[in-house]
């Protein structure tokens, strides 16, 4: 009679077979991700093909080592071991390593990292720095032996001779390339003599260009205080460094042109244009001032200069009349006061009263004399100043009528007694002045 096995015994037997089978200890498996929902730690999902499904488990330590994000429907290649879970009697694969399937693996990783960095704001235009219009020194991070550095040197030297180029020799592909790019970006930012950086390399496959897609390189370019031009690969090649850089150039030549937006010829043309504009502006100003002088020359003051002192003549007349009226008024007041006092003296007999009025009369006369003299002096001073001004202005009218004015050191000579033999005199005439020497004088 045959012995019947329990389910547990059968499951244990199968588990022992699975555990001891060398083919199941390290399985290479291809499948499509199904029923995936990202969890905080360990990941549980299925791998399937057209005909079968297997449960898959990835512990947190293995999941953190992935260079890409798992997604529903993604086809992946995994390495793991197959085991049986006794309580349910089901078998599954414990995944230790996983990569996207086929040649699109790096492309998937590229798109996933691009999406992540975009969401974090690394590619926003608001973070882009403006390139300087004029540069004196340009840093270049690239291979010292490639065509990139030669093209950059040739183009910059042609466009703007005198711009210095500082090369930071850098490994641009393979293991350690990303770290070397980051180190040289940091080194360049420590210098104070650089105006901008060009980071780039020649064309190649996506694997060759991958160093410029590394997240640490993107972070280094984003943090750079120097403006950075990215020139990686050919025009059709696009890297994450292109997205984060301040400007992207399709070729090294284009990068050099962006680094020198203004050429030497542009500056010479600009200076010539400025000189011409300055000349035209000066010419317009001279014409404007000439027209102003012509207008002033036709004004009434220059055609009828006597109008300059008409007001002074009127003022002198007013001062003269005011002085006469003031003197007459003071004299009239004095006579009236004297008549009043005399009348009172005639009608009063007391000696004391007479003496008192005599003293008041004397005081009044003194005050009147002082006041009249003060006002007379003030009016005379004002009259003399006005008369001097009038005489100064009037000399030109005298000369204009054919007379001459003789001066000795700015003093007008009015008599032959004022000069002696050998004195030097200046004679002012209508159209100029001559100097003469006295031959026969006092």
Swiss-Prot record:
Transmembrane segments: none
Domain of life: Bacteria
InterPro entries: Exonuc_VII_L, Exonuc_VII_lsu_C, OB-fold_nuc-bd_dom
EC class: hydrolase
Hydrolase as UniProt keyword: yes
Record carries keyword Acetylation: no
EC number: 3.1.11.6
GO cellular component entries: cytoplasm; exodeoxyribonuclease VII complex
Compartment(s) where it occurs, according to its Swiss-Prot or TrEMBL record: Cytoplasm
Recorded catalytic activity of this chain's protein: Exonucleolytic cleavage in either 5'- to 3'- or 3'- to 5'-direction to yield nucleoside 5'-phosphates
Keywords of the record: Cytoplasm, Exonuclease, Hydrolase, Nuclease
Protein family membership: Belongs to the XseA family.
Subunit structure and binding partners: Heterooligomer composed of large and small subunits.
Record's protein name: Exodeoxyribonuclease 7 large subunit
Species: Streptococcus uberis (strain ATCC BAA-854 / 0140J)
Lineage of origin: Bacteria, Bacillati, Bacillota, Bacilli, Lactobacillales
